[in-house]
Amino acid sequence: MKKTNKAIIYVRGDNRAEQEMICYFYAYRHNIDVLFVTDDIEQVANCEECNMVLVRDASRISRKSIEYYQTVKALNKRGIEVVTTITPENVEFIVNMLKEDLKRGETI
């Protein structure tokens, strides 16, 4: 039986809409079900259904490196993988999709 990936999108700081969009594109490309979007790391840690947290880049977890490593380690211990979605492949996919939309004359 194929494992279903269920994720929470975690956004923090400025440009939340951009962070969310990049994560949704990543989820779409990798067949990941997004349960909800939050800016509360405790909600992520307490989610019993999810096995992933999608973030634009992992530094969004915490600006302080010690807190970052402790948080990621704690999430991993609970079976929640932290996934950075601002990969070159994901950005290229988004750009190419937008170019195709523009060629067809669609508006964003």
Model-derived segments and spans:
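Short, structured surface patches at the beginning of a domain
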Residues: 1-108
